[in-house]
Amino acid sequence: MNNFGWVNMNLIKRVGCIAVIGSSLLICFLGVRMNAEQRRQQKIDYAEITIRNEAEKITFLDKQLSKLYKDETDEFLAESIEEVQIKQLESKINQLKTEASDFGLKSEHLPLDISQLSKDKQVLLSKVADIKTKYTIQQQLQEMLVQAPENWESTSDAVIINENATVENLLKLHNDVVQFNSLWSNSISAFLNEMNVQVKLYNEIEQGIDKMIDGQALTSEATLETFIHHFNLVTQVKNTTLRKGLSERLE
């Protein structure tokens, strides 16, 4: 009987320990689950507030992007635009939270429908990409001109190439511009065409002079007729520095 009682006591102790451990595990599990629920609810509350704020941000950023265009047609860029403005707006647009993953949640846990916000963000990204591409092309074109155009909407006699203008550079820009089909691309193409005419004229004169001169001696190509022809062509070169260089070679 004593042995039997001793066994029963041990069994009771073991069962008690198991019960205590089980209770502790259950409490821990419930605590972890409760904490997880609380954290998720905090994320949901944060998402609800943020989503409403993001909608206001999108409206504000859209207005800021519109200011980088000359007018409401969103075609030509404003004259005072700077690269830093584009980068700052692009950064702010990329920071917009418009996906469930931005809040560490699944779509079904979002308190509000943000599908429209996602679409609006993509519209902003497309607009800033348009602005950035146009700005880059205009800057590259400007680097090949003596003076930046006062008006990108139409060419004028003020369009004068510098030494950076080459057939290759102009062709590369042309290939970038033709991807657009707009008033802006038509205008930029007109600039490129005028610049291309000037580059080809300069190349024609330079190549002609090269044929007439071999070191310090004249070649058989150096006739009075070819000299007069190239001299007349030189007068058509708009860039005074380039024109002077060609004239000195003909002297």
What are these model-derived regions, one by one?
Residues 2-251:
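Amphipathic alpha-helical assembly segments used for oligomerization, scaffolding, or translocation
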